[in-house]
A protein has these predicted regions:
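Short, contiguous, well-structured surface segments enriched in hydrophobic/aromatic residues
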Residues: 1-72, 94-95, 141-151
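Polyanionic, low-complexity intrinsically disordered segments
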Residues: 45, 55-82, 89-196
Length: 196
């Protein structure tokens, strides 16, 4: 923490202090942060910080280690964070399904998407829509980062249920853009998570 810029250090201290009364991590704060003489283990630190602070810490580690794989994962996680924030604030992800972005698309993600979006122009179009890009990036990041078979199995079950819900309301079949997006997401789930 001592290597942070003053503004980032103050923000981190504030975020940690906010958790001092938390039912879930207040005891960690009392044990490791209140007592200035103790060192806080990384696992406890990660339990107490926000997702944004976690990514800042992850970036620090990537720069310190000069590791390209960690850096690539970091940029995937920035996109995951955007989708997570939208979901946390109960935003309707498909409200404006045609909204585009100008972000550089991860080359590995493009290659993986080529397995189920054969046409290069169709792939560019789908990955160019921000909501589709964020959802596909989140699924791809899970594939690359999650090593727990139990968590992966649970996610497979959740995604199988999601596939069933996509066209539960027939209104979605009438909108070509939503139908095309859902079809791509179903193919991504089937390809990456082996759900049939």
């Amino acid at each position: 923490m001592n290597q942070l810029e003053k503004s980032n250090f103050e923000q981190l201290q504030h975020d940690l202090w906010k958790n001092s009364g938390s039912l879930y991590c207040g005891n960690l704060y009392a044990k490791y942060i209140d007592d200035q003489n103790k060192r806080c283990p990384v696992w406890a630190f990660l339990e107490m910080i926000s997702f944004g602070q976690y990514l800042y810490f992850y970036k620090y580690c990537a720069e310190l280690l000069q590791n390209t794989e960690i850096t690539e994962r970091l940029y995937l996680m920035y996109t995951v964070k955007s989708l997570r924030n939208a979901c946390a604030h109960n935003n309707c992800i498909i409200n404006d399904i045609n909204s585009t972005h100008n972000k550089r698309i991860n080359a590995d993600l493009q290659r993986e998407c080529a397995k189920f979006i054969k046409s290069p122009s169709s792939r560019r179009r789908h990955l160019g829509h921000i909501s589709t890009y964020q959802i596909l990036t989140t699924m791809y990041a899970h594939q690359r980062i999650c090593i727990s078979t139990g968590v992966h199995k649970h996610i497979c079950g959740e995604l199988d249920e999601l596939k069933k819900r996509f066209f539960r309301d027939n209104d979605y079949r009438l909108n070509d853009n939503i139908k095309a997006t859902f079809d791509v997401l179903i193919r991504a789930i089937d390809t990456w998570f082996h759900i049939r």
